[in-house]
């Protein structure tokens, strides 16, 4: 079963490297619990942000707070079902392990360092949905920057 590291996504948190290349895909759509979380939260796929929107930061300026929260709750649901989060708390070690497994990154890799930085940046946020979306957005944005810099090298 694939896990979301924001997907991390996003976690997702998340074959993020490959998912971020397909900017039209919805965040989290490649993971096993995607449909389950949409159903449980009464969210339609049309309400979810695309990976491109999140990577570029457009999700923060083009959408209402309720849409941001809804998207975050879907991310949190998937993270929790994959055992990466309980409520608003991350299992940081499991996130790292699953991220390394999904991406093939190694400890010390810039992608793992980006995940660590994103977890650190969001660790004190109390709202589990907001925290999840911000984490996924942070990881996706970092991966996009790293992919751009490696393509330019």
UniProtKB/Swiss-Prot annotation:
InterPro entries: PBP/GOBP (IPR006170), PBP_GOBP_sf (IPR036728), Pheromone-bd_protein_Gp-9 (IPR022354). It is found in: Secreted. Residues 1-19 form the signal peptide. It comes from the Eukaryota. Disulfide bonds join 37-77, 73-129, 118-138. One of its GO terms (molecular function) is pheromone binding. Belongs to the PBP/GOBP family. This is Pheromone-binding protein Gp-9. The lineage of its organism: Eukaryota, Metazoa, Ecdysozoa, Arthropoda, Hexapoda. The gene is Gp-9.
